[in-house]
């Protein structure tokens, strides 16, 4: 894990804020690309809520969130380690990258709160001229994939099939042909709230206990479900931790 950067005065000018942004961005990109195996190892799902920090000197750090409330700076996404083993590695890294981009912008414009309108536009223009963390991660991924056109085509077909499988699993608590009978599954109850199955609502099934849940009850959206390889409901997740 990289060491934290020493505390320095908050940047005030457009140039200084952009320099701070660039250093933090470089650290985050390094964590998700060059140092990805080390970063992955630090994000143990059994640990407490962890965050990925990028520092102005280009270093990165996986650590617990700041204890002071409110924090001195906007905080990055909390608990990135919890989703690590429930998603494909590539999808999880992309999710972390998206949250990292959001955090970088929030920090930059936190520092730029006292800039005037023209200065904020110039700051955003400087930031926007650089690839996002997600784009940097995707470019590196595509560079590896393009080494073999045949392999790339195969992976695309496989990914499409997997996405279709997830969509089918999470759309309703039964997978049947055109003869799907909604009345047959009206007795399916949500494992959290006990509500009856409704075809107009998003549901997701637990791969461990095979119970079904409203997506809203377990805080899973259709978009998030597409990136989950094996879903474990809150009860199954907590029981695993208690045994350990």
Swiss-Prot record:
This protein's name: PHD finger protein ALFIN-LIKE 2
Subunit structure, as described in the record: Interacts with H3K4me3 and to a lesser extent with H3K4me2.
Entry comment, domain topic: The PHD-type zinc finger mediates the binding to H3K4me3.
PROSITE patterns xref list: ZF_PHD_1 (PS01359), ZF_PHD_2 (PS50016)
InterPro entries for the chain: Alfin (IPR045104), Alfin_N (IPR021998), PHD_AL_plant (IPR044104), Zinc_finger_PHD-type_CS (IPR019786), Znf_FYVE_PHD (IPR011011), Znf_PHD (IPR001965), Znf_PHD-finger (IPR019787), Znf_RING/FYVE/PHD (IPR013083)
Subcellular location: Nucleus
Protein family membership: Belongs to the Alfin family.
Organism: Oryza sativa subsp. indica
ZnF (PHD-type) ranges: 187-239
């Amino acid at each position: 894990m990289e060491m934290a950067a020493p505390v320095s005065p908050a940047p005030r000018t457009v140039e200084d804020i952009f320099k701070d942004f660039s250093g933090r961005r470089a650290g985050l990109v390094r964590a998700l690309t060059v140092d990805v195996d080390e970063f992955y190892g630090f994000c143990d799902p059994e640990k407490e809520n962890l965050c990925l920090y990028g520092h102005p000197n280009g270093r990165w750090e996986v650590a617990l969130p700041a204890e002071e409330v409110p924090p001195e700076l906007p905080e990055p996404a909390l608990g990135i380690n919890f989703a690590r083993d429930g998603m494909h590695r590539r999808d999880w890294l992309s999710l972390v990258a998206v949250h990292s981009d959001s955090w970088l912008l929030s920090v930059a414009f936190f520092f730029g709160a006292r800039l005037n309108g023209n200065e904020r536009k110039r700051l955003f223009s400087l930031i926007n001229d650089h690839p996002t963390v997600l784009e940097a991660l995707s470019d590196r991924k595509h560079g590896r994939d393009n080494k073999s056109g045949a392999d790339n085509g195969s992976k695309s077909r496989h990914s499409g099939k997997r996405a279709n499988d997830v969509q089918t699993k999470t759309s309703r608590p039964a997978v049947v042909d055109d003869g799907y009978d909604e009345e047959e599954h009206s007795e399916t109850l949500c494992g959290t709230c006990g509500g009856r199955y409704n075809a107009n609502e998003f549901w997701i099934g637990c791969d461990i206990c095979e119970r079904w849940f409203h997506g809203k009850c377990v805080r899973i959206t259709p978009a998030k479900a597409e990136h989950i390889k094996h879903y474990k409901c809150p009860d199954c997740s907590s029981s695993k931790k208690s045994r350990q």
